[in-house]
């Protein structure tokens, strides 16, 4: 999904080891308790087991998440961390939660938009839907995006534009892996990017031209 956000950043990051943030660890661990009593002490102990070096000050962040999530009626999960894959499309991923009705959810450690969902999250839902359709043989209408810090769950119905964007993203990925240096999108988040100088000096060239 990082290709969709900014393919140039993905180009530079593709050989770097990825690690989840402390905030994500907290939100992810809390998600296992949704639909049940949210005990801050219990969840924090689990967080420290999963991530011993977690920033202690983020205990307050956990409290904020619990307060927000306590205002929403959640369905407990019957399955968690379910791997999905599509051989046809060459994609794979993980579903965070599946409820008793078969509805799937992905967990986000960011706040929710006032309305709707982020483009990258819509793409995640579309990718999971494609995987599930291939695995089950059934049409998948969409899935939930659960913004833990705000205690918000939003259903996104997959649209044709989501599937088109997913196909375009796959094309970008193949080009990058073939050695191409992609163009950055017009709305790329350049100001917060650590690769901004590299991007401005080399965008549009192929890897062979940079060596």
Q: Residue locations for each model-derived region?
A:
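Short, conserved loop/turn and helix-capping segments at secondary-structure boundaries
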Residues: 118-123, 160
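Short amphipathic alpha-helical face segments that pack within enzyme cores
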Residues: 123-131
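Short beta-strand-loop-alpha-helix junction that forms the active-site gateway
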Residues: 107-117
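Metal-dependent nuclease catalytic cores that hydrolyze phosphodiester bonds in DNA/RNA
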Residues: 1-98, 103, 211
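Active-site catalytic microenvironments for nucleophilic, acid-base chemistry
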Residues: 17, 131-135
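Metal-dependent nuclease catalytic regions and adjoining charged, substrate-binding loops involved
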Residues: 75-90, 115, 134-211
């Amino acid at each position: 999904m990082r290709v969709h956000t900014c393919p140039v950043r993905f180009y530079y990051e593709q050989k770097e080891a990825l690690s989840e943030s402390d905030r994500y660890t907290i939100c992810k661990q809390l998600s296992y308790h949704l639909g049940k009593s949210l005990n801050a002490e219990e969840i924090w102990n689990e967080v420290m087991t999963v991530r011993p070096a977690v920033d202690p000050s983020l205990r307050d962040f956990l409290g904020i998440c619990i307060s927000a999530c306590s205002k929403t009626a959640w369905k407990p999960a019957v399955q968690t961390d379910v791997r999905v894959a599509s051989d046809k499309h060459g994609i794979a991923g993980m579903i965070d939660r599946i409820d008793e009705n078969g509805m799937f959810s992905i967990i986000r450690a960011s706040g929710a938009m006032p309305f709707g969902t982020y483009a990258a999250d819509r793409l995640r839902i579309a990718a999971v839907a494609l995987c599930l359709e291939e695995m089950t043989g059934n049409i998948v209408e969409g899935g939930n995006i659960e913004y833990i810090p705000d205690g918000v769950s939003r259903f996104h119905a997959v649209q044709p534009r989501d599937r088109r964007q997913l196909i375009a993203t796959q094309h970008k990925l193949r080009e990058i892996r073939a050695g191409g240096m992609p163009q950055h999108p017009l709305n790329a988040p350049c100001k917060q990017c650590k690769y901004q100088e590299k991007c401005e000096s080399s965008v549009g060239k192929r890897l062979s031209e940079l060596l």
